[in-house]
Amino acid sequence: MKIKKGLKIIGIIILIIVVLILVHTIRNTIIISDLQNKVEKYSNSNNYHIKAITHISENTTMIINQYQKNEKQLLILERIVNDEKVKISYYNTGSRIDMFTETKDEKIAELGKVNEILGVSSMTPLQTDNLWQTILYSLPTRIKTVKVNDYECYSINDFLSPYNLLGKNKTEYDIEKETGLVRKIVLDEQITTREYEFENIDDSVFVEPDISQYTLKEKE
């Protein structure tokens, strides 16, 4: 009798655990699917500006400004180490890509030497190929509500999609509830914040600097 009662209790406990896991996974899947749908219109935009600030260490900061308007692209990378800045700007006119490098000692222009601009990887870290993948990656995920720079966000931890950048010990994406845009990324000790503009990029942004101020490095 005691054995049967014990087995019944164990069965009830297992059932409760299974139900809790199902509820957890269904909730996460619904939230993530909703964010995927909301961000889609922004991911398809060809008129935008993304600013990403990454604190790599106490003395090192990386600032990325990425602009696109139709076929025109501009990517500005600034790396600041102990208050010394290196700035690299890539201008894509649609026919070629020109690179301008600035340090405290020199300015160098390289015209047509780069084949591709690689900027901010994605507007969303929640990319999956299908619903089954979303469900699978939702299982270990932890989601809570947070505020990032006055934006209401979901803090999504351990969504371990192969399309994401992943930390060794911590992977956290804070994603705006209203738009699905990622506002903050935490990969271990590295913290990145992002800001966005859409449908408001002026052509003047893509005007290259005065090349006479630079040393021209010939294409090899």
Short names for language-model regions:
Residues 44-51, 70-76, 148-158, 179-184:
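Short, hydrophobic/aromatic-rich segments at coil-to-beta transitions
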Residues 2-72, 204-220:
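N-terminal leader/targeting segments and the immediate start of mature chains
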Residues 67-69, 90-95, 169-186:
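A short, surface-exposed beta-strand/turn
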Residues 51-56, 80, 156-162, 188:
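Generic short beta-strand segments
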Residues 28-35, 43, 95-165:
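Flexible, processing/modification-adjacent segments and terminal tails
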Residues 65-126, 192-195:
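An acidic-aromatic
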Residues 57-59, 82-85, 103, 164-168, ...:
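Glycine-centered tight beta-turn/hairpin loop motif at sheet-sheet or coil-to-beta transitions
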Residues 5-11, 140, 151, 168-169, ...:
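Non-transmembrane domains of secretory- and envelope-associated proteins
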